[in-house]
UniProtKB/Swiss-Prot annotation:
GO BP: Mo-molybdopterin cofactor biosynthetic process
Lineage: Bacteria, Pseudomonadati, Campylobacterota, Epsilonproteobacteria, Campylobacterales
Positions annotated to bind substrate: M74, C75, H76, M112, E113
Organism: Helicobacter pylori (strain Shi470)
Annotated protein name in UniProt: Cyclic pyranopterin monophosphate synthase
One Pfam short name: MoaC
Family as reported in the entry's similarity comment: Belongs to the MoaC family.
PANTHER family reported in the protein's UniProt record: MOLYBDENUM COFACTOR BIOSYNTHESIS PROTEIN 1 (PTHR22960:SF0), MOLYBDOPTERIN COFACTOR SYNTHESIS PROTEIN A (PTHR22960)
Keyword Transit peptide among UniProt keywords: no
Assembly and binders: Homohexamer; trimer of dimers.
UniProt keyword annotation of Nucleotidyltransferase present: no
Active-site annotation: D127
Cited function: Catalyzes the conversion of (8S)-3',8-cyclo-7,8-dihydroguanosine 5'-triphosphate to cyclic pyranopterin monophosphate (cPMP).
Length: 158
């Protein structure tokens, strides 16, 4: 399969989506941040000096989705209909799992926006509690589901 972001001279290009049909596009991505017990407890007990960590991560994730085309060179700038972020507390592993669901009516999908949303949300958590635990790990950032468009639906294997 030829790469769509290269022209005949093997130079980068942005794909022309002008002839594509506008359809509903949805993408769900997820990722996890793991930390020590002290950092986890500080977040859930709202004792972080920088402020409300999880609420700030949600706002940052929304901003990340909106700014995707400014940071990923070949991403199209598209209007987003909605970004919904959910953060699950995983007490036994001192982790948080962040989910981002992005929706649009467009000629191209929102997978990158969902992945960017997760990444920025998790990085925000790291930034806000790095004074407590610099050894935090971000892992498993992945596309869980996408629907709409020519390639159809995708569901990650569980």
């Amino acid at each position: 399969m030829p790469l769509t972001h290269l022209n005949e001279e093997n130079q980068p290009k942005m794909v022309d989506i002008g002839d594509k049909e506008t359809t509903e596009r949805i993408a769900l991505a997820s990722g996890r941040i793991s930390m020590n017990k002290e950092a986890y407890d500080a977040i859930v007990n709202h004792c972080v000096k920088k402020g409300p960590v999880l609420q700030t991560a949600i706002i940052a994730g929304i901003m990340g989705a909106k700014k995707t085309s400014e940071l990923i060179p070949m991403c199209h700038s598209i209007m987003l209909n909605g970004v919904d972020i959910d953060i699950l507390e995983e007490k036994e592993t001192h982790s948080f799992k962040l989910y981002a669901r992005v929706k649009t009516q467009a000629k191209t999908g929102v997978e990158m926006e969902a992945l960017m949303s997760v990444s920025i949300g998790l990085l925000t958590i790291y930034d806000m509690v790095k004074a407590i635990d610099k050894s935090m790990t971000i892992s498993g950032v992945m596309l869980e589901h996408k629907s709409g468009g020519k390639s159809g639906d995708y569901n990650a294997k569980k």
